[in-house]
Amino acid sequence: VAKDLSLSAARLEAAWAGLDNVTAAKKELIEEAEMEPEDDFGEQMKLCGQAGSVWKSVTAGSEQIIEGCKDIVDEVGSQKIGKPYTGEDVNYIESPHSWNSIEDFYDNIVSVRNAYFGALGATSAQTYSVSAYLAGVDQAANEGVISAIEKCLEKIAAMPKPFVKNYKDAKVKDAIDACNDLNDALEVARQALIND
């Protein structure tokens, strides 16, 4: 399992940064498994709207990022937090033994913020980000996403720890609702882009 995970992580890094931009050990691991990524995802994103890009427009590339964000938010809200809370599957709790579930949920939403703002660790829109692009199309939709991201982070952080012992707390429902609100805001943003 560890080898498969290591290979998957190396392949993901190579798909984003390009095979020539990973360590020699990772490149060797990927090549030995014959699992070279077909496209350099990061380069494809940078080329949105240009000839040869997977995404024929900046809008299409932005929509792809928003869809990925929606997938993450839905997984956090309806599955990772929601399944235990609703009783659908109380064994679905992420990191139950380390008691890090809430940190994991929070970090998942931070990854959405990073994707939306266009950089790792970004707390505001970078020049070439979905947020900056959407602001030029529909500033209200952009502000709605930003506000919903921050509210979602706030509500997840407010859940009592550890999650494994508090998954029925009322603040858990607040976090689920905030995830749903963020998903709705992302859909408004997606619609604003495709209807522009």
Annotate each predicted stretch with a short phrase.
Residues 1-196:
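Mature extracytoplasmic or organellar-lumen-exposed domains after removal of signal/transit peptides
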